[in-house]
Each structure stands twice: as structure tokens, then as C-alpha cells.
Regions:
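Short, solvent-exposed beta-strand/turn "edge" segments of beta-rich domains on protein surfaces
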Residues: 17-18, 53
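Solvent-exposed, conformationally flexible loop/turn segments
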Residues: 1-6
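Generic marker of residues within folded, mature protein domains
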Residues: 17, 30, 40-42, 137, ...
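Short coil-to-beta strand junction motifs in C2/discoidin
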Residues: 19-24
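Extended acidic/polar, glycine-enriched regions
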Residues: 28, 34-103
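Active-site mouth of glycoside hydrolases
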Residues: 95-275
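Short amphipathic, basic-aromatic surface patches that mediate peripheral association
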Residues: 9-17
Length: 275
């Protein structure tokens, strides 16, 4: 266990009988009297996980509650000292923590300076595998240390293909079932996220957008919150993640400002690390 690097706990059990999102699994991690509460998630094939991002070094104890009852402890080693420089090569991997603000500037949690040099590849996760690999190779040789990309597929000129995976399974009537995340999709999405992290690239994840022909823009508020709940349970412990509520939010005509405020408040209340 090392400071700023995600800890993952895993258990095998029976498949959930109801929702695959709203599962009764949570953990409390304590160090020096500071307690962080996190929710677990279902990862498919009877696998349940809890992920935790230790932001300080020292002796940790934890208690798991819900469908799993367990206690544990471990010593978290201190991260290596911060190094000078802000180039991408200096920050490959996850050992510097999340990016925070300091005055008018950005810094990693270990105090290292972060100067964002970003680009967008909105439909990165939804392209054919050869194009994904070409894009990743290009990014690995680029100066970019921040990438904006989407959870939902994009319907737009040059992005007209059908993805191999979608974020959810479908119901018998053909509508999306937000309570049944597609594990193939989320494993695929995470694989890209981890590779970007290893390159020293921060992921500015766009949660909503209007470039849709599949019906994701038609979700009710209840469905949106279920979707966000799974995203937060599964991805919040990645130190390289940033949340971007939407691209061109004002083109999502079914959403008023109060809806956006509600979803923002939900994210703030359910992200234990406040990305």
C-alpha cells in the first residue's frame, strides 16, 4: 500500500438479485483519526470490489460493511519526494496524487507543479481497436498531459461507427437498463484510463454530451443518478480522474439548470476525494 496509489479489495460472491449498481457494500478507512467512507461496486462474474485512494501515509485500518463483513489493516508507505518539472515524462504513473489548485495554479498533491497541456479525443473508447491503438501510440509520443474523453458514444461527422460496447445492457423492450452496467464496456473503459495514467495523462471524463443517437440523452433524472452512482463507485479512486459534467450542456434540451445543479450536488456528495 503506497500513498497516492489506489488500493483495491476484492471478494467473490453471488450475483446481485436486483440492481447491479445500488449494492449494499461500503468501507471505512481510518488513518490518524481521519475516516474516509467509500462505496463498493459490482464488477461482474460474482466479483465485488472496494477501491480506496490513500492520500496520506501511515497506519490504516478499515472496516467493510454490508454484504461483506470484514476488517483489515496495512501500513501505507510515503510516496517518493516531489520532483521539479511539469513535463509529462516526469509524472508517468500515479505516485504524485490528484491534481489540486493552489492559488491560480495547479499542483499534484505531493506539491509537484502541474501545467495542463490538453487535447480532446471524445470518442476514444468507442472506436475500432486498431484506431484506439493508433491514438494511444500517438498520445504516448505527444506532449499532452491531459485528455478530455467521453463515457457515452458520440454521433458526429467522423464518429459514425457503432461501438463494440455500450455502458449498459438492454431490457427486453430494447431500452437501456442503467441498473445493469455492461462489464465488458467498463473493463474496456478502465483499461484505457489506466494506460493514460501510466503515460502521465490526466483524464477529464465528460459525463454527458448531446451528440447522441442511442437514447442516452433521453434518460430520466433517476436514471442519470443511477449512472452517476456507478461511475463514482467505480472510478473515484483513480487519482488521474477529473469530472466534466457535460460538453455543450445547453444543447441537452431536456435538462434545465436545476437538473445540472442536482447532478453536481450528487457528485460532490458521493465522491469521497472531491476530484
Amino acid at each position: 500500500m503506497r500513498q497516492y496509489e489506489m488500493l483495491e479489495l476484492e471478494w467473490k460472491g453471488a450475483k446481485p438479485e436486483g440492481s447491479w449498481v445500488d449494492i449494499d457494500l461500503a468501507g471505512e478507512f481510518s488513518c490518524d483519526g481521519i475516516i474516509t467512507k467509500v462505496k463498493g461496486f459490482y464488477g461482474g462474474d460474482g466479483i465485488y470490489k472496494i477501491r480506496f485512494l490513500p492520500e496520506r501515509s501511515g497506519h490504516y485500518t478499515w472496516r467493510i460493511k454490508g454484504i461483506i463483513e470484514e476488517e483489515g489493516e496495512a501500513f501505507c508507505e510515503k510516496a517518493a519526494p516531489a520532483e521539479e518539472g511539469s513535463g509529462k515524462a516526469a509524472f508517468e504513473g500515479t505516485g504524485h496524487g490528484m491534481v489540486r489548485t493552489r492559488g491560480m495554479h495547479f499542483v499534484y498533491e505531493d506539491g509537484s507543479r502541474y501545467t495542463p497541456v490538453g487535447t480532446t479525443v471524445y470518442a476514444l473508447a468507442h472506436q475500432p481497436r486498431p484506431l484506439i491503438e493508433q491514438s494511444m501510440e500517438t498520445l504516448s509520443r505527444s506532449p499532452y498531459n491531459k485528455l478530455r474523453w467521453c463515457v457515452f458514444p458520440k454521433s458526429f461527422p467522423y464518429n459514425e461507427n457503432e461501438p463494440d460496447f455500450y455502458p449498459f445492457e438492454k431490457k427486453e423492450d430494447g431500452s437501456w437498463d442503467v441498473h445493469r452496467p455492461s462489464m465488458a464496456f467498463w473493463e474496456h473503459f478502465e483499461g484505457i484510463l489506466r494506460r493514460l495514467e501510466d503515460m502521465g495523462i490526466q483524464s477529464d471524463i465528460i459525463l454527458f454530451h448531446p451528440y447522441d443517437r442511442w437514447g442516452f440523452c433521453e434518460f430520466s433524472m433517476e436514471e442519470n443518478l443511477v449512472y452517476l452512482d456507478y461511475v463514482l463507485r467505480r472510478l473515484s479512486a483513480f487519482p488521474s480522474v477529473w469530472w466534466s459534467m457535460a460538453n455543450e450542456y445547453d444543447m441537452l434540451m431536456k435538462r434545465g439548470m436545476e437538473d445540472w445543479y442536482e447532478m453536481e450536488e450528487f457528485i460532490a456528495a458521493n465522491d469521497p476525494y472531491h476530484h
